[in-house]
Amino acid sequence: MKKYAGIMICMALVMVLASCGRKNAQQSSSKAQQASQTTLQTTSQQSSQPQPSSQTVNNTKGLKVVGSRLCDSKGDPVQLKGISTHGLAWFPDYVNPDCIKELKGWGADVIRLAMYTSEYNGYCTGGNRDQLKDLIRKGVQYASDNDMYAIVDWHVLSEGDPNVYKEEAKSFFSEMSREFASNPQVIYEICNEPCNGTSWDAVYSYANEVIPLIRANSPDSVIIVGTPNWSQDVDKAALKPLPYENVMYALHFYAATHKGDLMDKMTSAIDLGLPVFVSEFGICDASGNGAIDESSANKWVDAMNSRKVSYVCWNLSNKAESSALIKNTCNKTSGFTDEDLTPEGKWLKRVL
């Protein structure tokens, strides 16, 4: 009996140990599941509350300017193609992760975040600065998430001379460049369209005060500088370029208005060694409305492609105008079908 009792005791011990092993395995599995759920929740929270200053970015995506060309970090020429938002204060809902991902699917590799300075609810005229900067942070985050570049655009327009709000610009770009210092996918556009008689000397003076503030935080980032006459007079910049590396010069066109003369001005400036970036264009007339001219637009695209000139199309909105990409009757902010697109939207999707 003692022999059998010993055997029974041993069997009981084996069963207890096995039970404990199963319990420990179940606890480990449960903890792993909880850890996975926590990670997903944390990731979701981080996605909804972008923190660009701490985000992980692809440091191989850095850009530099070599001669008149935009190049990758290895010095090979690149051509960015993408889309500009309309005013962030007026059409903020398009800055969302699904929309930016969809534009990437169209073939876009850059998104321009247009923040008006002087117009209604502009950054310098009563707009909510914290909300506008938060939209820029989100736009940069979503662009980085989709391996795209983001242009932070100080959208000078009705004030004409960027020196009007120079102090605000200096503060803004100092803050933004500090926040995005580790992100090589951020490009700074420091004055959209100097106009109303503003000279290149005035723009030059302004840029000489703003660029060093960006360089203090982000020494290698690409900076785009607007040119006089609604960013058409690149020829004047070509005769007196700024004394900084990795600086490009904006040329803007609207294909139904601007034809061979402006195209020739672009190619001549490039031939003189000026790095040109078409940071805004449309295929209608210069008002942003009116008739579409696809024939002229296609000639422009051919000219830009032949010189590897990067270009950004205006605009991501459903505003009732020819330059909007989305029909005025469409209230979606992502998941667009071809039926939701305007003629310019359909054209751009084909081109990209």
Question: Across the structure, where does each feature detected by a protein language model lie?
Answer:
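N-terminal, intrinsically disordered, polar/charged segments of Gram-positive cell-envelope systems
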Residues: A25-T56
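Aromatic-lined substrate-binding rim segments of carbohydrate-active enzymes
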Residues: N96-E159, K166-S171, E175, R215-N217, ...
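C-terminal motif of bacterial Sec signal peptides marking the signal peptidase cleavage site
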Residues: V16-S19
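Bacterial signal peptide processing site
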Residues: G21-K23
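Extracellular glycoside hydrolase catalytic/binding regions
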Residues: G62, G87, P92, K166-I187, ...
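N-terminal carbohydrate-binding accessory modules
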Residues: Q45-V110, G126, K346, R350
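Positively charged n-region of N-terminal signal peptides that target proteins for export
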Residues: M1-I9
